[in-house]
């Protein structure tokens, strides 16, 4: 028996156009989106199957990838493929309205849900870290997080700077698949940004894709640029090669005062995602193989230094927030007792949106034709004519966001509007206005699909932060509603032991049957978010549930 391979020197791109390589669009869609996750324009390290987020993979190994592709090409429209941590393990007869693929990634019994145990399983070829959209085949590059980051910066600007970020700057770190959205999001929100990254290859990736505007040669140069651009009122993003655990304390020592501080390094995974201060990347990767315990310790010690600097900025009155990478938890475990003194971004800025089921609705054009996305942009504006903020986002996205892989769009909308848009897109496919079917999905970071006490469900007003029934119910309901593929993951965003979350994707192929599935899925999916927040006592969610006619027996029947 040959050893499974996690490396292959190959370039993968999803097919374009209308010629099927599978038996129907319901199986062609997951096939193309799996391949799109590994497109070199999309993935961070596609030759090792890594899509984003440390070691977030699309398949467990290359042999599993090959078999998934072969199986999808042969799958019938009354069969369902089961994928267990990136490995295709079974095909079963179901029915036409069942999902074509069901995916479970990285799930561990809670007592064993640690990085140490997961890494043992991973080394034996028994598990795969799916992050959120890596192992669920609906990653669309950094655009997938741009609008959420933009909405966060805009809301922070409203709360702290009267809604005007002109002449202000954001300090952050991490330019990977998620963090790479920060510089563009800050620019779109009207602010300058200084973005620290320890790998030159990632800076090059963001410069190429126009997510970051320019690179400074050193810290002094970066600060000079920040001073010049903020004085001129320009929103320019600057990348700086370096280590945040070294640069942030130096900025504190110098008395430099940003206008906002956050972080999107891959701190959730100390073994693979956070470079210890004073180490080279090569040393880090080598020692991860030979002495993983020492690497984890060194990384977490550096995170503690990093968080202490963030706390120092907060104590100066600078708005400072965690952007969901669990760095506060890591620092607390290294003795920073007050690591949670600064809030996470969801309770600080995003939760009111979640209460109305508003979250990261996204779609991709299976044709590969950008015009299909531009036509859907226009349709969104037509169907939501009075939302100037949304229109501005779509205009900025078209102007500034480069497509990575298959053309795609992210657009935060909520209960009611998601189904309305999905049905309209399906009709555009039916009429031939779009040249091929569209897939609609979302991040697992959504209002009803995640339990993550250090991120999406931090500081719930009823104390239900760690209750993970909700993402399980979300996955079950999306399966019953007829989503094309459904995923249930553990550990995304914040690492092993700290989150459970689910995802769904639905195909708009222009058929009447698709319209029925779309209406169910795109109503029920955001509906679970409103339900979850209404159950926690949020009045905004309770009001939304009543307005939208949700049947919540313990709430809408009584209040």
UniProtKB/Swiss-Prot annotation:
Pfam families: Urocanase (PF01175), Urocanase_C (PF17392), Urocanase_N (PF17391). Pathway: Amino-acid degradation; L-histidine degradation into L-glutamate; N-formimidoyl-L-glutamate from L-histidine: step 2/3. Its main location: cytoplasm. It catalyses: 4-imidazolone-5-propanoate = trans-urocanate + H2O. It comes from Pseudomonas aeruginosa (strain LESB58). HAMAP family: HutU. This is Urocanate hydratase. InterPro entries: Urocanase, Urocanase-like, Urocanase_C, Urocanase_central_sf, Urocanase_CS, Urocanase_N, Urocanase_Rossmann-like, Urocanase_sf. GO terms for molecular function: urocanate hydratase activity. The active site is at residue 411. The gene is hutU. The keyword NAD applies. NCBIfam families: hutU, PRK05414.1. Binds 1 NAD(+) per subunit.
């Amino acid at each position: 028996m040959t050893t499974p391979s996690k490396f292959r020197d190959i370039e993968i791109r999803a097919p374009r156009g209308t010629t099927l390589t599978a038996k129907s669009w319901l199986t062609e869609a997951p096939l193309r989106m799996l391949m799109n996750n590994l497109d070199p324009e999309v993935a961070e390290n596609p030759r090792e199957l890594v899509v984003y987020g440390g070691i977030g993979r699309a398949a467990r190994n290359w042999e599993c990838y090959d078999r998934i592709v072969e199986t999808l090409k042969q799958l019938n429209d009354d069969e369902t493929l089961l994928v267990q941590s990136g490995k295709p393990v079974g095909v079963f007869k179901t029915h036409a309205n069942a999902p074509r693929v069901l995916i479970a990634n990285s799930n561990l019994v809670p007592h064993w849900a640690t990085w140490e145990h997961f890494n043992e399983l991973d080394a034996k070829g028994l598990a795969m870290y799916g992050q959120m959209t890596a192992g669920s085949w609906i990653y669309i590059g950094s655009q997938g997080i741009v609008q959420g980051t933009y909405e966060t910066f805009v809301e922070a600007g409203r709360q702290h700077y009267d809604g005007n970020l002109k002449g202000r700057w954001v300090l952050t770190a991490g330019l990977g698949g998620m963090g790479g959205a920060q510089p563009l999001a800050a620019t779109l929100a009207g602010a300058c940004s200084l973005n620290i990254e320890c790998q030159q290859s990632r800076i090059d990736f963001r410069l190429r894709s126009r997510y970051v505007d320019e690179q400074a040669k050193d810290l002094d140069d970066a600060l000079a640029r920040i001073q010049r651009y903020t004085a001129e009122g320009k929103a320019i993003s600057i990348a700086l090669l370096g280590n945040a655990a070294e640069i942030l304390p130096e900025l504190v020592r110098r008395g430099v005062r940003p206008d906002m501080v956050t972080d999107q390094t891959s701190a959730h995974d100390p073994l693979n995602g956070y470079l210890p201060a004073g180490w080279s990347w090569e040393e880090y990767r080598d020692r991860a193989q030979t002495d993983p315990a020492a690497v984890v310790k060194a990384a977490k010690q550096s995170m503690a230094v990093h968080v202490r600097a963030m706390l120092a900025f907060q104590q100066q009155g600078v708005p400072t927030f965690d952007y969901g990478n669990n760095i506060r938890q890591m620092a607390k475990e290294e003795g920073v007792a007050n690591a949670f003194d600064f809030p996470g971004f969801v309770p600080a800025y995003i939760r009111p949106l979640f209460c109305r089921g508003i979250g990261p609705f996204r779609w991709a054009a299976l044709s590969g034709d950008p015009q299909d996305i531009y036509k859907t942009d226009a349709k969104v504006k037509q169907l939501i004519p009075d939302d100037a903020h949304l229109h501005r986002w779509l205009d900025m996205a078209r102007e500034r966001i480069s497509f990575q892989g298959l053309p795609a769009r992210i657009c935060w909308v909520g209960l009611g509007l998601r189904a309305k848009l999905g049905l309209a897109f399906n009709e555009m496919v039916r009429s031939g206005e779009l040249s091929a079917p569209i897939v609609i999905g979302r991040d697992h970071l959504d209002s009803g699909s995640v339990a993550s006490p250090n991120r999406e469900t931090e500081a719930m007003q009823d104390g239900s932060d760690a209750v993970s029934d909700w993402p399980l119910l979300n996955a079950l309901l999306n399966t019953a509603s007829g989503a094309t593929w459904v995923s249930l993951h553990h550990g995304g965003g914040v690492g092993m032991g700290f989150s459970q979350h689910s995802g769904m994707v639905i195909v708009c192929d222009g058929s009447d049957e698709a319209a029925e599935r779309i209406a169910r899925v795109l109503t029920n999916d955001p509906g679970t978010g409103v339900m979850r927040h209404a159950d926690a006592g949020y009045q905004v969610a309770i009001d939304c549930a009543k307005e939208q006619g949700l049947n919540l027996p313990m709430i809408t029947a009584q209040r």
